[in-house]
């Protein structure tokens, strides 16, 4: 009789589970992408198409010719990376910058670790970091998914996406809700202390808070496994982001916060270990 082996979650039993979740996230991103098109017109379509084509091409070229293994395009993760990265970028980002960011996201953010489920940092964040290093980068311009033009409509699009993923049990509430609530509380405290700081609700509606909380911080591979760990992770992301914003880093505060906590996720998992089955 073979030995029974037990390990921590997540337990993925087949490719269908991964595809179901990734395609569910893609569907949840559709309202945000449509809102970007509504707000920015053809420029949003161009940016989305550049990002999508570049990410798909990067995945195909790297897996086929560098890694010498079957292409993994069917899992849908490259599409998620493309859409999230497009929402993080300014709408007038040059084509060549988007291409470099896409190759950085797929190559350095995912495939260099071995592929899906092995990366330690959200690939879309890696892609945005690559674009920020490019000459002439629009560092001070907000991403088209930051809700600058239509904050309430963008917030509605993000909430629709969040509601769908919660309904389908693609994600749990622990990370997004802890980020949103902590941001409101901490930003409210700073606004009371100094009225010059942004209103907490405006901070949540704009500045990429909802985009990061719903579609970036909730990435399975780069977030903690236990429920207490997820809540701590969300609180820490919000605290770092609010602190950075109070010191003048408006646009990239959420990206930096998620990036930092992605790196610290293994430590969070060690601190908040799930109780063993049968143990008090």
Language-model region placement:
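N-terminal signal-anchor module of multipass membrane proteins
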Residues: 1-56, 60, 277-278
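Cytosolic-side transmembrane-helix boundaries in multi-pass membrane proteins
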Residues: 1-23, 224, 244-280
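C-terminal ends of transmembrane helices
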Residues: 9, 57-69, 106-117, 160-170, ...
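Hydrophobic, membrane-inserted alpha-helices
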Residues: 28-35, 59, 78-86, 102-109, ...
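Structural signature of hydrophobic alpha-helical transmembrane segments
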Residues: 41-54, 92-101, 146-156, 197-209
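Long hydrophobic alpha-helical segments that form multi-pass transmembrane helix bundles
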Residues: 117-160
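Loop-to-transmembrane alpha-helix initiation sites
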Residues: 120-125, 200-209, 230-232, 248-259
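Conserved mixed alpha/beta catalytic, RNA-binding, or beta-rich assembly cores of soluble enzyme
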Residues: 165-196
């Amino acid at each position: 009789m073979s030995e029974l082996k037990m390990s921590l979650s997540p337990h993925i039993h087949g490719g269908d589970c991964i595809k179901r979740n990734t395609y569910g996230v893609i569907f949840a991103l559709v309202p945000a992408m449509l809102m970007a098109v509504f707000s920015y017109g053809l420029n949003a379509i161009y940016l989305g198409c550049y990002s999508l084509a570049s990410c798909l091409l990067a995945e195909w070229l790297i897996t086929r010719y560098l890694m010498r293994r079957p292409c993994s395009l069917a899992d849908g993760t490259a599409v998620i990376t493309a859409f999230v990265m497009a929402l993080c970028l300014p709408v007038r980002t040059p084509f060549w910058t988007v291409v470099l960011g896409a190759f950085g996201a797929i190559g350095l953010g995912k495939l260099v670790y071995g592929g899906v489920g092995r990366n330690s940092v959200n690939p879309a964040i890696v892609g945005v970091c690559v674009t920020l290093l490019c000459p002439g980068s629009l560092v001070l311009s907000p991403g088209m998914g930051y809700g600058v033009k239509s904050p309430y409509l963008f917030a509605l699009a993000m909430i629709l996406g969040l509601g769908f993923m919660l309904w389908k049990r693609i994600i749990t509430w622990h990370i997004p809700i802890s980020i949103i609530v902590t941001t409101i509380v901490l930003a409210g405290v700073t606004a009371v202390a100094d009225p010059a700081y942004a209103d907490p609700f405006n901070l949540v509606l704009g500045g990429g808070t909802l985009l990061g909380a719903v579609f970036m911080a909730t990435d399975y591979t780069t977030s903690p496994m236990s429920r207490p760990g997820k809540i701590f992770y969300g609180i820490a992301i919000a605290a770092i982001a609010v602190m950075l914003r109070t010191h003048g880093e408006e646009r990239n505060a959420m990206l930096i916060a998620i990036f930092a906590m992605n790196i610290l996720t293994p430590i969070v998992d060690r601190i908040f270990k799930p109780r063993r089955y049968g143990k008090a």
